[in-house]
Amino acid sequence: MTDTTAPEAGAPAAAAGGARRPFFRRRKVCPFSGANAPKIDYKDVKLLQRYVSERGKIVPSRITAVSAKKQRELAKAIKRARFLALLPYVVK
């Protein structure tokens, strides 16, 4: 009765001897911070529409990489534009 330490057939590549590199997620940078960053304005409908989904909902900052402070400004500008009928509340 001898024990063998051979890797099993269903073992991951790291156990077989080949080390796998960890997945590297690139850090997202806020598009509204920096020298040439656009100003958030409720009248700039073209800019605001990039941060509204096709159903009319505000896209979360984890998807758009907008900082928390700028996300609050963006949400306020979108809501103001909706109130003034520059943007629709819902899209059919």
Curated annotation (Swiss-Prot):
Instruction: Offer one example of a GO biological process linked to this entry.
Output: translation
- What stretch or stretches form a coiled coil here? none
Name any one GO molecular function: small ribosomal subunit rRNA binding
Keywords in alphabetical order: Ribonucleoprotein, Ribosomal protein, RNA-binding, rRNA-binding
Question: What is a single cellular component term in the Gene Ontology annotation?
Answer: cytosolic small ribosomal subunit
Q: Does the keyword Ribosomal protein apply?
A: yes
Q: Which NCBIfam families match?
A: S18 (TIGR00165)
Give the protein's function. Answer: Binds as a heterodimer with protein bS6 to the central domain of the 16S rRNA, where it helps stabilize the platform of the 30S subunit.
Q: Which HAMAP family match?
A: Ribosomal_bS18 (MF_00270)
* Subunit description: Part of the 30S ribosomal subunit. Forms a tight heterodimer with protein bS6.
- Give the family this protein belongs to, as stated in its UniProt record: Belongs to the bacterial ribosomal protein bS18 family.
PANTHER family in alphabetical order: 30S RIBOSOMAL PROTEIN S18, SMALL RIBOSOMAL SUBUNIT PROTEIN BS18M
Its name, as the record gives it, is Small ribosomal subunit protein bS18
Please give the organism: Caulobacter vibrioides (strain NA1000 / CB15N) (Caulobacter crescentus)
